[in-house]
Amino acid sequence: LECYRCGVSGCHLRTTCSAKEKFCAKQHNRISTLWWHGCVETCTEDETWKFYRKCCTTNLCNI
């Protein structure tokens, strides 16, 4: 699985996930306004006034 991850210049860098990491995730902390993209082992989608998380399982789906 390949996912996007964040770097200094934004969240468009590609990374190859480990065998344990089955999901790509995109998270947004609405309080700090920080984004995080990357590979995760488990993922539960969430959307509240302060936090957003989207999970997916296909290559580069977490744009």
From Swiss-Prot:
Pfam family, one: Toxin_TOLIP
Family indicated by similarity: Belongs to the three-finger toxin family. Ancestral subfamily. Orphan group XIX sub-subfamily.
Keywords on record: Disulfide bond, Neurotoxin, Presynaptic neurotoxin, Secreted, Toxin
Matches recorded under Gene3D superfamilies: CD59
Cysteines engaged in disulfide bonds, as pairs: C3-C24, C6-C11, C17-C39, C43-C55, C56-C61
Location relative to the cell: Secreted
Cellular component aspect of the GO annotation: extracellular region
Free-text tissue specificity from the UniProt record: Expressed by the venom gland.
Membrane-spanning parts: none
Function: May enhance presynaptic acetylcholine release.
Official protein name in the record: Toxin S6C6
Chief localization: secreted
GO molecular function, one term: toxin activity
